[in-house]
Amino acid sequence: MRGLIGALLPVQCAGCRAWDEVLCPACRSLAGRPAHVATIDGGRGPLPLVAMGDYDGPLRRIVLAAKHSARTDVTGFLNEAGARLGIALGGVLGLAGSPAAAVGVPTGRAPSTGSTVDVWVVPAPSSWKRRLRGRQVALPLARAVARALAAGARPGVRVRVVDAVRLRVGATSQSGKAGAQRTVGRMGSMRALVVPGPGVRVVAVDDVVTTGATVREMERVLGGLNAVATLCRPGLIS
């Protein structure tokens, strides 16, 4: 039956358009490379950003397929990429079990004190239409990030995914908007269902970071961020 379906409805690789595979080995391998560490301008100063690469080529097409193609299942890709991002975050935030893994990048909020550190991994909010269709990307990516971050963290670090932010009624899609339009479109567009308490480290996760408008709005409603994780950001890699 699967062969018949494949003959009638052939698939193409989401990344490079090669036939007969949802993701070819070369495109799948993009999720297995180490994440890049950079910074992004937040609303309260620079924030560390970890990303898998540029919003270009196969990686861009994989992200678009994950968001818009009902026939493309890239769950495995998101899980592997999320694991790489989680590993990088452990070093960036100084939470990794090995001190040698720490990376000296500014971390927004002041660090927690005491033996226990609580970390919230918060996905960027999706529209109600995308939630209804089950085409969310940020939420499953956030879950993968949290699993890897928790697995590699030192004792006393507690990591959980908190789906804490929603778009307000009337908020419009950012797709196709220029930079200034994105900034204006995201201002005041979100509300927090719950806010972190004092000392909680907060990581925002989104599939793509472009102008940083979504990050800054999440930072506003949550009261601050420590880091950002994303699949891709334009111009990250020189």
Residue ranges and their predicted role:
Residues 1-238:
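Glycine-rich phosphate/pyrophosphate-handling loop used in enzymes and phosphotransfer proteins
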